[in-house]
Amino acid sequence: MTASVEKLVYYIKAGDAVTIEPVYKVEGFRMNSNAGVKYTGNTYIEVDICHQHLWYYVNGELFLESDVVTGKESDPERATPPGAYKVWSRESPRKLGTYAVQGYETWVNYWMPVPYTGIGLHDLNRSAYGGDIYINNGSHGCINLPLDVAKKIYDEVTINTPVMIIP
């Protein structure tokens, strides 16, 4: 019998009307714990693929937010992988891709890779960001940002800053 059920049975038998907190077998992801154990802390970047938006929180306060373009959703090889990552490094400038391997090559001003697979946050000059651009005209998996947004993030972010990419 689970701990929650045991508690409920006890209170039912006692005839008590109470409100109890369930006992969880597995604890889910938390940004901060009340017990003082920090999981991601309160400085992190969140990227929402479905809404094509990014939020960057520094010390619990919204530092900036922006529309983005993520990986080309209609091509599984280019879709941005959801997950919990961290900023791996910071490079400025950086050449991404090679014609020989990826079939493209582009220079970016601000490069912040997140997983080891070569996907990251970077500036890319596009006519628009957000909306449904990513479905058929998305990136090769990276999170494309307007230049001014990429610069602000690059100037503030540190290596190991958590990056949550949600579907």
Residue ranges and their predicted role:
Residues 45-48, 55-57, 64-66, 86-89, ...:
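Structural recognition of the beta-strand scaffold that forms the well-ordered cores
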